[in-house]
Structure formats: C-alpha cells, structure tokens
C-alpha cells in the first residue's frame, strides 16, 4: 500500500503568472527502510517556460508498506 506521508521542504523561488506554461520534474532523492516497508523522498520541481528560477521546489515523502 502506498501512502502520501507529507512534505519535508517546500519553496517558491519565483512567482507563476496565470496562463504560464509549466512542466513538472521528479527526482528520487533518497529511499530508506522503515518498519514494514520503505520511505521515498522525491524532489518535485515545477519549471516555468522562459523563467530563470523554478516556480516551486518540494521534497515529498511517500511510504510504501509491504504485507
């Protein structure tokens, strides 16, 4: 079973204007064993077309529990 465990860190380096073209990118930062499964940290970056900085950078946590 997979669970959204929350966020470690969320930043908004640049404003995203309405109508902007964006894209998301995910990168696995870490994976560690926890009781009954594994916890994975994924860094999600929202890029704005033509922007120098991303609109959002967030480290999300997911837990996968195995039975």
Regions found by a protein language model. Give the residues of each.
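Short, basic/aromatic beta-hairpin or loop at an interaction surface
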Residues: 1-4
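HotDog/MaoC-like acyl-thioester-processing domains
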Residues: 12, 16-67
């Amino acid at each position: 079973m997979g669970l959204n465990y929350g966020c470690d860190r969320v930043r908004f380096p640049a404003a995203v204007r309405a109508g902007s073209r964006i894209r998301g990118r995910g990168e696995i930062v870490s994976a560690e064993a926890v009781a009954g499964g594994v916890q994975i940290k994924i860094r999600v970056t929202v890029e704005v077309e033509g922007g120098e900085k991303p609109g959002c950078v967030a480290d999300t946590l997911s837990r996968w529990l195995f039975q």
